[in-house]
Amino acid sequence: VNNIQGRQAERARFGYLGGYVGRLVPVLLVVISLSLVCNRTASLQNQNQAPPPPPTLGLEQGLLEFDTPDFKLKLVKASQTVAALQPKTAPGFDFTPSDRLERRASNGFYHLGDITLRVRTDKTGPWQELDTAKARQPVISLPTSGRVLASADLTPTLPANSPVQITRSWVVDNGQLSLQFEIKNKTSSGVEIGALGLPMIFNNFITGRNLKESHELCSFFDPYIGEDAGYLQVTRLNGHGPALIVVPDRNASFEAYQLLNEPMRPNQTFEGSFQWMVHSQAYADAEWKNAQPWITPTHLEILPGASKVYSIKFLLSDEIRNIEKTLIANQRPVAVGIPGYVLPMDLDAQLFLNYSPQVSSVVAEPAGSIIVKKEKPTRNGWQAYTLRGKTWGRARLSLTYKDGTRQTINYYVTKPETQAVADLGNFLFTKQWFEDSKDPFGRSPSVMSYDRDAEKIVSQDSRVWIAGLGDEGGSGSWLAAAVKQFGQPKREEIQKFERFIDEVLWGGLQYKDGPNKYGVRKSLFYYSPTDLPNHVYDPSLNWTTWTSWKKPDAEGIGRGYNYPHVVAAYWSFYRLARNYSNLIKNHPWEWYLEQGYQTTKFTFSRAPNGRRRVGYVDLGLMEGDIFLAVLSDLKREGWTEKAQEIEKLMKERADRWRQEAFPFGSEMAWDSTGQEEVYAWCKYFGYDDKAKVSLDSIIGYMPTLPHWGYNGNARRYWDFLYGGKLRRIERQLHHYGSGLNAIPALAAYRETPDDFYLLQIGYGGTMGALTNIDQDGFASVAFHSFPSTLKWDGYSGDYGPNFFGHAFNTATYVINHQEFGWQAFGGNVKLDGDWVRVEPLDSFRMRVYVAPAGLWLTLDSGTFSEIAINRRTHVVRVGLSPANEYTSDARLRVEQPARISGVAQYRPRRQLIVERDAYKIPLTKTVTVIELGTK
């Protein structure tokens, strides 16, 4: 809460205070104790902070300062842990939290250079914990020479009965900074190392900083848990270079990634401190025994009198996009997956490996889960493989190179995309379909939140919005149901959703009359036993916290984030009613577009007194691209005055953002939600400089890594508290940040198709949203990343915005990469003479991007069956699927968002009617082929 004080006064005008409480606690416009607000926030997380113990780090003894080719390194003299790690190419910037040293100087706080172990001398006995941060004493400085900057015996920091002696050295090795540990067995018997962790402490401390300070000073770090090929990348929040890459050097295989237990517990402005696990068997046998690890756990025995050296190196990349190039330049193994690391079973995926030793073996686990076929190397020697997923779920490839280097790549095998989405729709409209005419909250009929563990609808939760069709945690399921129909309509499902619109949404969740007409309630469910004396609230739930809104609170209309969900539902059904025959029967298309327009207008307009009706609308909203979609369709329909009205409202917001350094404010102190809509409107109004700030921010928190869970995974770590069953602060793998942030990433790629990095992260996020869908169609809110868990959450929660991002983005991208040649993200490629033939296999098959031509083909109705590109003439042939009972015409839009030298405007080579900026193409009982050319 305390780092957004600059916004609190503004938000209080809407009846909210900042931070978590802005999202969840309505308040009167009176003086309210901020301490009470903070206490309520902390009570949800159960993370009230105790005062730190006395300092033991030894800062009063001063610092040691060193100059390396890449860094200015400062060590605390007494501990020889890092006080600062400053890249020379970014004066004034520090990857470590040097400005928080005094606050983190007590026992229990970790610093770069610490080490943790579990050891034993009896192979069946208990593990002994060794931890250099637990009880600090000044280390014993050792003489140095040559390339060694500093060296110390860590014995004073270890228990007196430690069976090992640890020597730590800071070394410059071939011009690169290295951290080395020598572990020596002091005993007369073997010492087993069951766990060895290297704390990775970098500046992710957003607490107490405003957005500008956070983006300029802070970094996020993402692990590639990949054994010897693994690494940790540390990237600045502003998305600019340089980026730090921590890589294994000697014996430091990256096996697991663990949250450290520090006095300052994780919260919304501090994700926590983590350690790189080199060995983890002792945890795998105990705390992690119920989890399926990313890597097979290891342990090691050190014989009497023997020593083992572990070391890591610190590399510097000039920018985030060049991390892979930096790894290659430093002879590190690099993997590039196309389309990523999610494998639909009908897709031929590609894997390219850059490492000078050849691969000696490739093993898929579970056996047969992935079929691997070796291909010819690329022209510059990348080793190439074609992959086909065979067994649904998590899988991994374990690679061994001829020099003994090991690499693991974790994949997720899904059903074919169209089948996965069909399963999602079926589950939503059967298992999650709620019908109870006696429901006192007016939720029937609807698609409601679901508990997969209990196999039942969540009809009650003390976080009332989850059971009340509100917020993201309660709206998620019906939102996913709506946008699923947009791209994969099914009449039986549409009939049910029409009932939801007429019986629950319009007039229930959304007011249909009175002064709040078009306002969206925060929740239909609420906790008010006095209002409902005959309703039995589950006594096992805690109804005493601020999350259990009373009826007046639930009826509030002030949370702007609730409105895009409603607009998305109306817009999806407008598109269906307008472009298909006999799918939508309860209202004409005009009604749906009018509802989308009126809801948008209400969201952003002001009351007669000049105040906002709805809070947070000066911020970027999740799914905010939907408002641009409504505006575009208002224009196409010739509803000019209404379009101008919406445009005026949006320009007021964009003009405001243009004046802000980092216009990504949120109901949270830092968030990854506003960038999507800020990018869209800044591009629309020509504020390209501010759009670039948005895109750079996304690049800062949305990595590409050889791992299905982290590739394209936009950073989110607190929403298990609000939409999950297992409630805690934890990095969420493929929460809705993945799908939503992929929208601007891919939009930017379509304008700059030579920026392969944007395609990697954008498509990774788009595909990530499919992994949430299980074999029966249930979609989880997100995957738990802690090594003790590593499983999907039991609640459906706020998956809906994630699927919105997928639905808004899903497409087949055809590229001609300078190294990898012709490839397709979301389809299969076949070379046939002069022709490159692509079978689209994405979820909807309604969008194709041909990168060499900068050509963006989209369908308002119909689907693509094939795209063929002539490499000599550059003609593009479009194959359209046969007509069906709902689709007699395809409506094709031809756009060229990228300006590519030598490429003229594409248009159909036969005369076609144009309606609403789309070519109307009559379909037949067989595939219809349309040829596009520039002449």
Roles of regions detected by a PLM:
Residues 78, 159-166, 171-230, 405, ...:
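Acidic (Asp/Glu-rich), glycine- and aromatic
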Residues 206-210, 325-346, 407-449:
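Low-complexity, Pro/Ser/Thr- and charge-rich linker/hinge segments at domain boundaries
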Residues 154-173, 319-336:
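Low-complexity, acidic Ser/Thr/Pro/Gly-rich terminal tails and inter-domain linkers that flank the onset
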Residues 24-36:
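Bacterial N-terminal signal peptides
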Residues 309-311, 439-487, 499-934:
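Catalytic domains of carbohydrate-active enzymes that cleave complex glycans
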Residues 54, 59-160, 207-283:
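Acidic-aromatic substrate-binding/catalytic surfaces of carbohydrate-active enzymes
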Residues 357, 361-423:
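Extended acidic/polar, glycine-enriched regions
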Residues 70, 300-318, 924-931:
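Short Pro-Gly-centered flexible turn/kink motifs
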